[in-house]
């Protein structure tokens, strides 16, 4: 069982079955802040026929994420989490083949029928670029807030996820 909500690559390995076709994890838990060991999990899953999906909603625009370096097959994110338009997101996928899930048109390289919301897509791209351009400045600010909080907790026992 996960301790403090922390899932390890070994636990994923032990949970894989012969009929497992997809492993899907969060990159970071939105309530606890725990960041899963995505690269290590991907290293486990690559030795199995299953595909690996990562829900990166909580980290996109806050941390640099390179799906190819992580070794994941699918990654999803939502623009509103990095100050983009609501109602738009994206699905990254590498070489994995999958059947279309909405039939009727040839949009999205014949993977999904329907007209793309180009204005929302452009807004999402602009917001993501801006988030990544401000990454270092934002991380320094968040780190200063963390240090301020920790100084106030002096003498109090506490636990920090991922430390």
Regions found by a protein language model. Name each.
Residues 1-163:
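Pyridoxal 5′-phosphate
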